[in-house]
Structures are given as C-alpha cells and as structure tokens.
C-alpha cells in the first residue's frame, strides 16, 4: 500500500546501511522460489507475510520449519508461522522446530540472551544432524530415525544439557 511504502521510506532514513528495495508481492513470491538468496530480511504487512511464509515453508519442505516474530518498537510476539493444525492435534506427530525456533528468537531479540538462543538453534540442528526426523520431513525407510514431537523435544533438551553452561 502507499501508506506502507511511505512508512518504510521514512524509517529507512534511520538505517542508512540497510538496502531497501520495494518489490510487489507477486514478484517477491517468484524470487523466493527462483533466487531465495537475494533476500536477507523481508518486511511486509501481515497478510503478505502469512502468504510468503507459507510459501517459504513449502520450499523448505514443511511449515514446521518456520518460526516467526512480529517485533515492534515496544512489544513483540513469537509464534510458529503455521496454524494450529487441528488435523494432527494430539497425535504427537507435529514438528516442534518452528515453536522452539520462535522461543530461540524471543530469547535473542526480546531478552538479549544471544548465547542461549544460539545454543537452542545448535541443539535442534544437532538432532537433525544425528539422523532424526519428524514425519513431516521424511518417509519411513528414508534412512532417518523417525521421531515424535515429544521425542524431538527430549532430544533437544539432552543436547542442551550436554553443552557447556553459558
């Protein structure tokens, strides 16, 4: 919208080292598929953010890999970018990565706990690196160890316990 562009143009004056490029949402969707590395950060209104974050989840292979943050000057909230997934509620098959990732972002951006945030990201990466996978990312027999939501969480906790204290 015109108002959105005006606000972004005004705010960019406060960040002279940040390159700002206005892209229409349909073009951004195409670039996200064809040249995703052209983006470092994408800032947009909520409706477009919902659409493009779902597309990003599709590119990655699962909405379960998409943590998100809405950060304002005084307040912030963090949540997985996917919905509540009522179709899998109570089945212990959801990928908790996006929820845990949202917590990691909260630790860093709202509480300044950078080391703790990095440890949380590292713990999750370690679980995947050891060959574990949640059902949304792989099929049985694909050479990975399929785990449940709670098992993923337990493995992340074990990884954190094995790390040096920060």
Regions found by a protein language model. Name each.
Residues 31-132:
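Glycine-rich phosphate/nucleotide-binding loop
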Residues 125-166:
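Glycine-rich phosphate/pyrophosphate-binding loop and the adjoining helix
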Residues 20, 25, 29, 34-39, ...:
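A glycine- and small/hydrophobic-rich beta-loop-beta segment
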Residues 15-23, 112-119, 129-140, 166:
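Flexible, glycine/charged-enriched surface loops at secondary-structure junctions
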Residues 1, 96-100, 149:
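Short alpha-helical patches at coil-to-helix transitions and adjacent helical residues
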Residues 1-26, 40-41:
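Glycine-rich phosphate/diphosphate-binding loop of Rossmann-like nucleotide-binding domains
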């Amino acid at each position: 919208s015109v108002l959105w562009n005006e606000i972004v143009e005004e705010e960019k004056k406060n960040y002279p080292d940040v390159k700002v490029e206005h892209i229409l949402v349909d073009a951004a969707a195409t670039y996200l598929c064809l040249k995703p590395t052209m983006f470092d950060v994408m800032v947009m209104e909520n409706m477009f953010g919902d659409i493009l974050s779902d597309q990003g989840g599709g590119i990655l292979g699962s909405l379960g890999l998409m943590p998100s943050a809405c950060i304002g000057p005084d307040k912030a909230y963090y949540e997985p970018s996917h919905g509540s997934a009522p179709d899998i509620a109570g089945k212990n098959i959801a990928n908790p990565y996006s929820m845990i990732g949202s917590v990691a972002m909260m630790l860093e951006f709202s509480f300044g706990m950078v080391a703790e945030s990095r440890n949380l990201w590292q713990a999750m990466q370690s679980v995947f690196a050891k060959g574990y996978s949640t059902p949304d990312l792989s099929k049985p027999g694909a050479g990975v160890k399929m785990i449940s939501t709670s098992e993923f969480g337990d493995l992340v906790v074990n990884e954190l316990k094995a790390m040096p204290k920060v």
